[in-house]
């Protein structure tokens, strides 16, 4: 039976470049791979055709011979010689094609596995609001893995050094034939590092790292808030056998303040005033992070009114304008009244015309009028 054209098998033009051929091969090989079509003889035959076409068209010399002489170039005694026949010859390595698709099967490529970078560490730092707003330097002590001072991270005893792995010759990977494919795996002798330690350091037992605690001075910039994270490069755990160290991340948590609440760059506080000041107006001393200031309260101030003190908030660590302090007035009801005070309040209430006095309590008048209308509507 006549063989099909290799370009036709892969569905590419004769002018297709290697990238297009590889793309077509990957798509078709995935579709007709024997593992996906177990027991399907037709799919197995197509897969053999696809592999054969790919092997010829990605080899410069074989492709040139095929373009000139067709299949005759690879028949016994033909121009190509070598007796190419499906899976039987050629020995092509397909792990580069499937490396991104079947990474686990083929060992993820041909790169030598490097010694592992040190792990990143996290430290939770609690700050007062004042420390967060103004900035502070704090000393912290953390347990970590540091580079061994005896072998300087190599893991080998003093006077010796790691030896090139005799199994993989420093490549970190070995090739194994599995069925139709040449599979790359991490070297079982050196575990992918490309070197072995024949005589390990007595201090770190060949790991290149030892357990220690270290003290660091951490500078917290002004304006940080809960959830902010500060990175100290290279202050994490030391890497294995001389690999780079990880980083230390300081996680900021600001304690609740007894006066202020922070919302982004603004501060909020509640300022209690008595009902006399609320009615007549006056001045009251309020706290800020910069010290005490006087707040002018106008006459007829209602509870819940916000007063903004510009520039008395927080300057964010990310820059921008400084926030404001917003004071929320809370009008306090007097308690523990004596008889004289109660009498005076009753007289004052009578002068207002009762709880629904229109002139002195406009909101109360509106409220009670609404209540009266509500009940009138119910009884109709």
From Swiss-Prot:
Zn finger intervals (CR-type): 135-213
Entry's Gene Ontology cellular component terms: cytoplasm
Tell me where it mainly resides. cytoplasm
Pfam families attached to this UniProt entry: DnaJ, DnaJ_C, DnaJ_CXXCXGXG
Asked if Magnesium is a keyword of the record, the answer is no
> Source species, please?
Erwinia tasmaniensis (strain DSM 17950 / CFBP 7177 / CIP 109463 / NCPPB 4357 / Et1/99)
Q: Name one GO molecular function term.
A: ATP binding
Name the InterPro entries on file: DnaJ, DnaJ_C, DnaJ_domain, DnaJ_domain_CS, HSP40/DnaJ_pept-bd, HSP_DnaJ_Cys-rich_dom, HSP_DnaJ_Cys-rich_dom_sf, J_dom_sf
Q: Which residues bind Zn(2+) 2?
A: 165, 168, 187, 190
Residues covered by the J domain = 5-70
Q: What is this protein called?
A: Chaperone protein DnaJ
Swiss-Prot/TrEMBL keywords: Chaperone, Cytoplasm, DNA replication, Metal-binding, Repeat, Stress response, Zinc, Zinc-finger
Residues annotated to bind Zn(2+) 1: 148, 151, 201, 204
Q: What is the required cofactor set for this protein?
A: Zn(2+)
């Amino acid at each position: 039976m006549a063989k099909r054209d290799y370009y036709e098998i892969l569905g590419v033009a004769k002018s297709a470049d290697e990238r297009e051929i590889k793309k077509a091969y990957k798509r078709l090989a995935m579709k007709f791979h024997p593992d996906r079509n177990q027991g399907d003889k037709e799919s197995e035959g197509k897969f053999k055709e696809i592999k054969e076409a790919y092997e010829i068209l990605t080899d410069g010399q074989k492709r040139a011979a095929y373009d000139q002489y067709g299949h005759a170039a690879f028949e016994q005694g033909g121009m190509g010689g070598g007796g190419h026949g499906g899976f039987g010859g050629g020995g092509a390595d397909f792990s580069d094609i499937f490396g991104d698709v079947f990474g686990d099967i083929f060992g993820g490529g041909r790169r030598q596995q490097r010694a592992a970078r040190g792990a990143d560490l996290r430290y939770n730092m609690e700050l007062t609001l004042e420390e967060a707003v103004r900035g502070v330097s704090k000393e912290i002590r953390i347990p970590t893995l540091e580079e061994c001072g005896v072998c300087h991270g190599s893991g080998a005893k003093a006077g010796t050094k790691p030896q090139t792995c005799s199994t993989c010759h420093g490549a970190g990977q070995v090739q194994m034939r599995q069925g139709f494919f040449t599979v790359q795996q991490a070297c079982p002798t050196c575990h992918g590092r490309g070197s072995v330690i024949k005589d390990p350091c007595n201090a770190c037992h060949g790991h290149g790292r030892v357990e220690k605690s270290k003290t660091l001075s951490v500078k917290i910039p002004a304006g940080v808030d809960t959830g902010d994270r500060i990175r100290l490069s290279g202050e994490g755990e030391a890497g294995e056998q001389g690999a780079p160290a990880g980083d230390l991340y300081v996680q900021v948590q600001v304690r609740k303040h007894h006066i202020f609440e922070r919302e982004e760059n603004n501060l909020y506080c509640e300022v209690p005033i008595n009902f006399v000041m609320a009615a007549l107006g006056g001045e009251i001393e309020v706290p800020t992070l910069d010290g005490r200031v006087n707040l002018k309260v106008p006459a007829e101030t209602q509870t819940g009114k916000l007063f903004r003190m510009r520039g008395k908030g927080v300057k964010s660590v990310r820059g921008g304008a400084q926030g404001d302090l917003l004071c929320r007035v809370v009008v306090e009801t007097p308690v523990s009244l004596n008889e004289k005070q109660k009498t005076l309040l009753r007289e004052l209430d009578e002068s207002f015309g009762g709880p629904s006095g229109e002139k002195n309590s406009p909101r109360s008048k509106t409220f009670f009028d609404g209540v009266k209308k509500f009940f009138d509507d119910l009884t109709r």
